[in-house]
Amino acid sequence: MISPINMKPIVEDNFLTPADFDPLKKELFGDFFPWYFHPSVATDDDREPSHFFWTHIFFERDKGIASNAYKKLHPIFNKLKPKALIRVKANMYSNQGRTIEHHAHTDYPFKHKGALFSLNTCNGSTHFKDNIKIQSVENRMILFNPSLPHHSSTCTDAPVRVNIVFNYF
């Protein structure tokens, strides 16, 4: 599977089999899965009170594996076939009663690949250049160029919006 570098995002629904997807979703939506609060979504200086989210780091290039749940991602790695990981993290955006669109950002300033995997269906979305808006749909993978500006939004029809972002070569 190839992530686009200069193309429009690629969407693949039903990315994982139910046998691989269900345990991953159960883990991230479980009562004991650790989520960590961040007061800004896009950049550190974005301190609007409604622009917060929760994250969980699975892997970071300078630290390596950072989560006991990392092994649950192997079915995704088997399909993405990364040569090297930069970062893998889960994002959880709380329903705030209205849709909040976060500021545009790039994940890293250098050329690499990106994949965004949705854990639940909701009316939250990810926005890309050329007014491309892709809804969060359970078990949907979006392959995109994360060094180009993009932004997220919250949802209003579910308690949370949860996805996993993969940055890799």
Task: Say what each PLM segment does.
Residues 1-83, 96:
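Non-heme Fe(II)/2-oxoglutarate
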Residues 81-91:
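A short coil-to-beta-strand element that immediately follows conserved catalytic motifs
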Residues 92-94, 119, 168:
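Short beta-strand segments enriched in hydrophobic/aromatic residues
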Residues 95, 134-151:
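Conserved metal-binding segment of the jelly-roll/cupin
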Residues 98-104, 110-112, 118-137:
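A short beta-strand-loop-beta hairpin characteristic of the jelly-roll/cupin
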Residues 103-105, 149-157:
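Short beta-strand His + acidic residue motifs that chelate non-heme Fe in jelly-roll/DSBH
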Residues 115-117, 158-169:
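A short hydrophobic beta-strand segment most commonly corresponding to one strand
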